[in-house]
């Protein structure tokens, strides 16, 4: 088997570089999962439990990206892990993974738009949720109609804003932790006392495991590096660079951010109705700081949503390119954009959005749960595909021929699989997160059954 004979069959333009890949991935990751759901994680697992959960999630994502790096460098195709799962696990699994991942972003986009609308109500409390959600949907769709080169530049700019903003938040929060800046409700430096004020795990181990789905959702998007390799110039060089820099940046930012939030935000005040970042800045007392942060979070959500629509439309294109759905969706316009795939994805988003606008405090968590389950299933396919790829590759090649290698293979990929399975099992311990199982499992089984009926193979 040759590791260099996988080419895209469409007319995508290879206009992305390593920085574009990095910012596309960061753009997909840093959204409502960090800015809103982090409050839910603290409320459920406690401050210390939230820090532990995000550390565990960071390790798990890092392990997944080892496997994705090897596959993406060896086979730089649009569709990424869907294609790898089809070839190295089974066609039915590839079909299921692609639709689960598409579902992940359709649901995630709806929740991002709801999250953005919630934040806008800080300034316009009388305007209905659906109005702002619709406005954000139109903007995201418009950005995705740009050519990939201009799209990458726009995403780079949007992602840079939130990277600098999070860095500033970490600095301000750290100054408040050590008493250099005042913090409402404290007469002395709060330090890290709040992290253990409710005990290490106030809701027990069950509370910790139950939030892992939300944490997985917070990290979803990092795998976009693989999806975009088919539109990347010199992927053998750009992909490893992007993976290394992206993972390092995300781990540092996520962990430090959660430590700051856990140190300053009491468990009783955490939730998803108001962004925890805004709550903290309000308590620090910076004039207009919370409003500024509110705007920055909106920018972050816009960036994450733009990346999400990009990923979902490319996944539909990949399915069509392999003949698993109508070939009409494989068509790409003169700007190198799969417009029909984008429109179909937006239809799915609108359906999910309509279902969420009347009960955002409950439906929002259900949407996050479904998206979190779907992305873990997609992640699960990555190390399994790497194990299959390495086994096939070694039949005719040596490991030294691989330009990017997953260390300690197959042991490390199998450890990754076990950790992902544990996080899936944890869904059953939180009633508010079980929607992921109730909706995700039947959808997954349905994909397998449909594929077998249509193509007569699993």
Regions found by a protein language model. Give the residues of each.
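Helix-loop-helix junctions that connect adjacent transmembrane segments
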Residues: 7-13, 51, 125-128, 160-295
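Hydrophobic transmembrane alpha-helices that form the core helical bundles
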Residues: 52-53, 62-145, 150, 170, ...
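Membrane-interface loop-to-helix entry segments
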Residues: 117, 131-189, 219-220, 243-244, ...
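Membrane-interface "cap" regions at the ends of multi-pass membrane proteins
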Residues: 1-39, 43-48, 62-66, 78, ...
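C-terminal membrane-solvent junction of multi-pass transporters and transport-like membrane proteins
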Residues: 157-158, 328-339, 379-431
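Hydrophobic alpha-helical segments of multi-pass membrane transport proteins
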Residues: 143, 166-172, 316, 369-399, ...
């Amino acid at each position: 088997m040759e590791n260099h004979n996988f080419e895209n069959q469409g007319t995508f333009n290879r206009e992305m570089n390593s920085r574009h890949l990095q910012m596309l991935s960061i753009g997909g990751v840093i959204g409502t999962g960090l800015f809103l759901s982090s409050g839910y994680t603290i409320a459920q697992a406690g401050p210390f439990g939230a820090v532990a959960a995000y550390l565990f999630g960071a390790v798990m994502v890092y392990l997944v990206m080892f496997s994705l790096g090897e596959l993406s460098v060896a086979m730089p195709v649009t569709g990424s892990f869907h294609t790898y799962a089809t070839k190295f696990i089974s066609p039915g699994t590839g079909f299921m993974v692609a639709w689960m991942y598409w579902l992940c972003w359709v649901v995630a986009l709806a929740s991002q738009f709801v999250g953005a609308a919630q934040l806008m109500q800080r300034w316009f409390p009388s305007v209905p949720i659906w109005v702002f959600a619709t406005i954000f949907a139109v903007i995201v769709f418009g950005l995705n109609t740009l050519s990939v080169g201009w799209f990458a530049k726009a995403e780079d700019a949007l992602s840079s804003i939130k990277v600098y903003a999070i860095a500033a938040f970490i600095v301000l929060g750290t100054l408040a932790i050590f008493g250099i800046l005042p913090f409402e409700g404290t007469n002395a430096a709060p330090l890290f006392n709040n992290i253990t004020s409710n005990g290490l795990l106030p809701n027990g181990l069950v509370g910790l495991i139950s939030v892992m789905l939300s944490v997985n959702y917070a990290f979803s998007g990092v795998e976009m590096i693989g999806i975009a390799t088919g539109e990347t110039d010199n992927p053998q060089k750009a992909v490893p660079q992007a993976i290394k820099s992206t993972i390092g940046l995300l781990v540092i930012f996520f962990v430090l951010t959660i430590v700051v939030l856990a140190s300053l935000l009491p468990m009783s005040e955490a939730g998803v109705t108001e962004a925890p970042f805004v709550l903290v800045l309000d308590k620090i007392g910076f004039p207009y700081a919370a409003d500024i942060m509110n705007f920055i979070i909106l920018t972050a959500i816009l960036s994450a949503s733009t990346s999400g629509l990009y990923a979902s439309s490319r996944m539909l294109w990949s399915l069509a390119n392999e003949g698993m759905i109508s070939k009409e969706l494989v068509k790409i316009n003169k700007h190198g954009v799969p417009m029909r795939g984008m429109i179909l994805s937006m239809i799915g988003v609108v359906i999910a959005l309509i279902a969420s606008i009347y009960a955002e405090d409950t439906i929002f968590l259900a949407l996050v749960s479904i998206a979190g389950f779907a992305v873990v299933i997609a992640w699960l396919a990555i190390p399994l595909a790497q194990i299959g790829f390495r086994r096939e590759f070694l039949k005719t090649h040596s490991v030294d021929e691989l330009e990017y290698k997953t260390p300690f293979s197959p042991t490390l990929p199998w450890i990754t699989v076990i950790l992902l399975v544990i996080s899936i099992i944890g869904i059953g311990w939180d009633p508010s997160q079980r929607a992921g199982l109730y909706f995700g499992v039947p959808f997954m089984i349905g994909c397998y059954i449909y594929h077998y009926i249509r193509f007569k193979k699993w």
